[in-house]
Amino acid sequence: MANVISMVKKVAVISALVEGCSVRSTVRLTGVSKGAVLRLLSSVGKACADYQDAAIRNVPARRVQVDEIWSYVGAKAKNVKPEHFENGGYAGDVWTFTAIDADTKLVISWAVGARDAGCAASFLQDVAGRLSNRIQLTTDGHRMYLDAVPDAFGEAVDFAQLVKVYGDATEGQKRYSPALCLGTKRIDIIGDPDHKFISTSYVERQNLNMRMNMRRFTRLTNAFSKKLENHVAMIALFHMHHNFARIHQTLRVTPAMEAGLSSHVWSIQEVISLTAEPLAKAA
């Protein structure tokens, strides 16, 4: 008969994962096998995605910022080989779209996919469906948003783009650092956006949080995701922790509490309890 992982061990595993530990370092820290760690991640991640899909509704946001962050699964696009797609697998670039409430810091929605018009449109339609009122929306200058935003919101949005102007980087900086930003342009697209609030600072900070707190997003390591399903599960878990379980330093409460979606700070055990499935310890 297989041994079931104790709740204490489950809490240790999930705590390590949301604090930026890789799967293998989590194995070393907790003594739980790699297979069991991944099964727990998969189960809890799906439960977190389902819970947030139901709970994050009718959000009374006023200002929303949207951005997308790059990562990859299996191999970078330039290194993908036919064997990566064996058994229905996926390899290559993966983008995560994020929409954050600039006031409460609640991540209203996220989507994992390609950086293209189709994914942008689907993502923004989901964002629009979770809001209870008209918002001011800011994105970067990517052209895909010019069609995706009106498709999702029509004219019922104050939409602006913050377009960054970049200079040339030196040869060494091109590989390890973004190009030097020389300035920005604020461009009104729909409605009457307030220029004081045309910003992507909060969502860009959230991108940093993702890179810091999910090891599979950290550049120049071998901790990248090997399976798309695990990548998606970790992103759902990360956002559950961010929205419901982690106190924001400035707000002094969680984003979900600030947004009126939760009455308390969730514990890791509560997050795990979203799924009641026992997970057998791998031999």
Residue ranges and their predicted role:
Residues 1-283:
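Residue-level recognition of single "structural anchor" positions
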